[in-house]
Curated annotation (Swiss-Prot):
Pfam families: UPF0262. It comes from the Bacteria. NCBIfam families: PRK02853.1. Belongs to the UPF0262 family. This is UPF0262 protein Saro_0143. InterPro entries: UCP032146 (IPR008321).
Length: 164
């Protein structure tokens, strides 16, 4: 019986140029939530008999997102199965918007009213949801996943794009 899920996720540390405490917290939460509950089935690997769980490494190479998928052998490693490459051009606007809204959100938490924070958070969720839908479209035919997993993956894609 297969177990089509991510059991381990890694971000290419060389890709991450800058972090702050707020973004680091977002990263930790996204990884924790992703490992706790996700649906992730790389179609080529699954059809070849590799039914999960999977290890996933996210990196940016030549301006493109690389999702490197390996079997999880239970010992911290596994066989490389495939690397799915996605162009990031369509994600630039949502990433930029997400960062701008997150910046406003983090500032608002410190000094705004509950209503103002809620308004900013709704905008943040809207951009996040739109980007997750876009990611689902881009993964179609390559990796089967669900909306919640795509949402958390988008958070991690954003972490890879932080510039100080």
């Amino acid at each position: 019986m297969g177990d089509p899920r991510i059991s381990h996720i890694e971000l290419d540390e060389a890709t991450i140029i800058w972090r702050n405490a707020d973004i680091e917290q977002e990263r930790r939460i996204a990884i924790f939530d992703l490992i706790e509950e996700n649906t992730f089935k790389p179609l080529r690997a699954f059809e070849a008999g590799h039914e999960g769980p999977y290890r996933l490494k996210l990196s940016v190479e030549d301006g493109r997102l690389a999702l490197t998928v390996s079997d999880d052998d239970g010992n911290g490693g596994g066989q490389l199965l495939e690397t799915v490459i996605l162009g990031l051009g369509r994600f630039r606007r949502p990433i930029r918007e997400y960062f701008a809204i997150c910046d406003s959100y983090y500032q608002a938490i410190r000094k705004a009213t509950a209503t103002e924070i809620e308004t900013i958070d709704m905008a943040r969720r809207g951009v996040h949801n739109e980007a997750a839908e876009m990611l689902l479209e881009r993964l179609q035919g390559k990796i089967d996943t669900d909306f919640a997993t795509a949402r958390r993956l988008f958070t991690l894609i954003c972490v890879l794009h932080i510039r100080g």
